[in-house]
Every structure is written in C-alpha cells, then in structure tokens.
C-alpha cells in the first residue's frame, strides 16, 4: 500500500506492505543474539505439504507491518551504536552545506531539506576503521556476523543438499562453501575478495556483502537529471527498487538539488548507496570539466562521506597516456566520468588528478570506510570496441590502484563493461581476477549486442548471467530506457527483475548451495497446479497472476489443472499426473504389459503379449479415448483386482 505518514509535508508516498503471501521474519545469529537479520518468508498454501520458504530480503523496514514509516524522519540508525562501541571514531560538526552543493539552485526550485541532522563520525588515529582493517587483524565485526546469517538465508537445517549442489555447479575457481560462517566472511574480506560497503555514517544500513563466493548481487541506478525527475520521485524509486530485490542503489543525480536528493535517499535507505562524486563536482564548476580542481573534488568527497555514501565510483584509471587509444573506436569514450576526466587531461595536458592524488583519496575514504568502486571510464560502448587496448590498459591500472588502496586499509571493488559479445565475456572475468587480485568485479551487463534499443535489459541480462556465472560479484542493472531516457519506476522494476533472474541463474550455475531451493519449490507447485504458490514463489507475483488472470480470472481457475496455453486436454503435467494415478492402480498382469521382462515394475511372471492384449481390450472397453476420467479408471481397476 501507499501511505503519506505526514500530511503536513509535500513528501511523496512510498510503497510499503508485504509482497503477496509473504511476511517479514528475522533470524538471530547465535554469536550475536542482539542482531535481527531480515528475511522474507513466502507462505505456501495448506495443500503444499511443505514448510514455508525463507528468501533473501532487501526491502528493509518498508515491508514490516510493525514499523511506522515516515520518510520525513528517516529510518532507525542501529548501526551507529555498533560503530561507536568499536571505538576509534569521533563525532564532529562536519562541513557546512554550501549553495554549490545543490548546484546553486534558486529558492524557486530548491527542494525541501531533510530536517533531521546527524553529526558525522570519522576515524581517528591508527585504530581500525574499515571492515578490511578489522578483517586483517582477525576481528569479526557485527557486520560480518550479520551478512553471514543473511547469506545462509536463515535455513541451515535445509542445506543438507549443499554438497551435492556445489558438486553439480561449475564455479570456475570460486570457493563457495556449503555454509557461510562469520569467520569465512572475515577471511574473504581480509583477502580482498569481498567487501561490506558500509560507511560509518550510514546508520540506517542493513549490511550486505559483495564477493564471488557469495550470492550474486545486483545494483539499481536512480537519480535526477538536468531535465527531469524530483527528490520525491527518486526516494520513491529507491524504495521501489529494493522492494523488488536491488541489493545496492546508486544515486547518479546530475541536475539540481544533488545534495538534498542524496540526503533524503540515504536517510531512508537500508541498502548501500553509491555515487559518482565527479558528477556533483562538475555541477559545482558550472558543468565545465576544464574548471575542475583537486580541491573541489576533495571537498565533494568529504561532503558525501559525511552524509554516509557507502561506495564511490572513482575513474582514477583514466590516464592521459591512454586517451589516444580510444581515437579509433566506433563509439569513443562512453563513460560520463571517463569523458569528463579525459577532457580535463587533454585541456591541461596533465595526468589525471584522480590518479596523482590517489593516496590522499585513500586516506580520506578510510576515515569513513567508504568503499572504492574503481570506475571503468574507458569501457567499450559498442561490441566493436570490446576488449581493446584502451579497456585493458585501464584495467591493468585499476589492478595497481587496488594494491595501493588495500595497503591504505580500504575496501575495493572493480567496475567492468559495458558492451561485450558473448564469446569475449569470459576473458574479461579472467583478466580482472588476474590483474586485480580477485577483488570483486561489478559490471554493467555486459550488453551482448547493439541492435535492440528499448530491449537492452534483455541484451544485457544475457551477458550479466554469463559473467555472473564466471565470477562477477555484482551486476549493475540496465533498464529498457538504456540509451533512450531516464528510467521511471516501471523501468526500475523491469530492470531489477531482469537482473534478479540473471543473478539467480548465475548462482544456480555456480552451484550455490541454497539457490535451487526456490526453483524446486516452484516446480513442485507448478506440477501440483498450486497456482497461488506458483505466483507467490516467483520474483514478481503481481505480474504472474495478472498474466494468468487475463484469460482465467475466476477463483475456480486457481485450482484448475490446466492453463490457457494448452487447455484441459493437452496439459502435459495433467496428463503425467493421470498416467501416474493410472499406473498406481494397475494390477500385476497389467503392469506386466507396461514393463520389460526383469524391470523393477514387473512383480510377477507373465508374457508381455498377454498383458498387451489385456490392456488393448480394456482401452476399447472404456471408450477408446486417449484422455480418461480418473474415477472410471479406479472403478475399472477395482473390478479387475
């Protein structure tokens, strides 16, 4: 349902309430009984004969009926106490908000400011601040315990098939365990193979983990532009995206009210929020890349870190010496951040200040535990440009920068393409693992063909499923509006569902031990014609039921043993059920006709010819119909027995 909890404001309503036949539940880790780890339990029908199914849940408090949602106040901030209890931080006043933070917007167009103010925290001295630093020192944090419980989906007792699932998959060298422990989480973070993006100032965050030995995650992009959208719409899109399964959200706003938009999103977001700081820095210098300076950019990093942004995309790999490599490309430089830095480098004929000041960037981000998302500013924007020297030269530099960031105590993931045909995808994954020390890979698709404007959620979903299988840790969604316009909330949902499919398909292929439980539950519901369970076990129950109701809308149709595709007489699953019922009621002589001599189904001696003749006579006796009434079959079998 939609609610407007404070009618005195102009804040837009956001979507709340549980998904169909679902309820919010919480798991409690044995090692931290004070933690409440959210899950969604899908409630199956009484006739299912199996337990309800817990699934991973990204929706935050918005689907918990016991929580009163007021976007004007924001979400609760329990993580702030975790951070303070660990020590090594100080609370301070923070920088003042400046007019340029919101693009010098005039009063007529200024968005309402978020009224609740929280003094920011920052790290002090050499005490560990980041999850990477704690992990390297052998310390298991509450965040690590939290994500371990989340990854196991609160169902340790249901993972008896875990070893079989792992053996069935092809993980391409990933080390997915049968069960995730907090110690395993700590070890993966310490190795740099996983990150928990969790700024110490994002107290509303429900921690999650990104790494190839965990569930494949997806990101949804939102954000305004200079020509469209508002703060209200972006907050609504964020809540809508996480409802359908977005694990993280990036605010890519480039228009007015950037600071205010981001504050509203962060204070109401239970998932990590990422940004591309160069976008806001550009707005502060009238949109002219040539006017950018290190000082301006640094101030922007501090501004966003104090607000609580969990990861920054930083295009530090776009170096002056690589720009000429893009000259022969079909589509040149397609990354906004990459093109901004390329223009700055050429205008000043200097090395990028993101590269030359990288050490300082690390020191700044460490104080807040902002994770790096090292941007691929030279990613290919067409399949013709895939895997060229410009793309891979930048990737090699990102590998060098990763080692510097680790040495400084920062968490790191690496961004990837882009537009890559299917036969060139795996080399991207393999090269990234080699060059970047197995740091998590985070890709935009990739799009596998360039011929489908309006359907690029599909062209990219194909590539996303493949690279997720090969080891990519997080997939950035693409919506139907890609290359065409700013996505609305319908596009956001389509993009999220498409990428949930891709991520889940990758987990199945890798042999993730918990992945197939939901598939099997839905398959059983499908075979048993439990229509409501089919809808509710799916990623999008509303759409599934709407499609079914277009042709079979009555309640009686929800228990029918057919759908409108095949009708009552040609449903393969109905026929199979009839065959099973029929076989179960056969006498011994009849079974002899169905099974070869020596088959386990043949329990007494007898000639096959006699059995076949008997069954032929019975077929004629019952009307020579291929499709038989089950009750008549049972009566006939009783007469024969």
Swiss-Prot record:
Record's keyword annotation contains Ion transport: no
Query: What is one GO cellular-component annotation here?
Result: cytosol
* InterPro entries reported in the protein's UniProt record: ThiC, ThiC-associated_dom, ThiC/Bza_core_dom, ThiC/BzaA/B
**What residues does Zn(2+) bind to?**
419, 483
UniProt binding sites for [4Fe-4S] cluster: 563, 566, 571
Q: What is its EC number?
A: 4.1.99.17
List where this protein forms a coiled coil: none
Q: Which reaction does it catalyse?
A: 5-amino-1-(5-phospho-beta-D-ribosyl)imidazole + S-adenosyl-L-methionine = 4-amino-2-methyl-5-(phosphooxymethyl)pyrimidine + CO + 5'-deoxyadenosine + formate + L-methionine + 3 H(+)
What GO biological process terms does the UniProt entry carry, in alphabetical order? Answer: thiamine biosynthetic process; thiamine diphosphate biosynthetic process
The pathway where this protein functions is: Cofactor biosynthesis; thiamine diphosphate biosynthesis
Q: Which cofactor does it need?
A: [4Fe-4S] cluster
Q: Which Pfam families does UniProt cross-reference here?
A: ThiC-associated, ThiC_Rad_SAM
Kindly indicate whether the keyword Aminoacyl-tRNA synthetase belongs to this entry: no
Which residues does the annotation say bind substrate?
Answer: 221, 250, 279, 315, 335-337, 376-379, 415, 442
Could you give the cofactor binding note from the entry? Binds 1 [4Fe-4S] cluster per subunit. The cluster is coordinated with 3 cysteines and an exchangeable S-adenosyl-L-methionine.
Assigned keywords, A-Z: 4Fe-4S, Iron, Iron-sulfur, Lyase, Metal-binding, S-adenosyl-L-methionine, Thiamine biosynthesis, Zinc
GO MF assignments: 4 iron, 4 sulfur cluster binding; carbon-carbon lyase activity; zinc ion binding
The record's note on quaternary structure and interaction partners says: Homodimer.
The protein's matches in HAMAP family, at most eight in alphabetical order, are given as: ThiC (MF_00089)
Which family does the UniProt entry place this protein in? Belongs to the ThiC family.
Role of this protein: Catalyzes the synthesis of the hydroxymethylpyrimidine phosphate (HMP-P) moiety of thiamine from aminoimidazole ribotide (AIR) in a radical S-adenosyl-L-methionine (SAM)-dependent reaction.
Q: What is this protein called?
A: Phosphomethylpyrimidine synthase
Whose protein is this, by species? Rhodopseudomonas palustris (strain TIE-1)
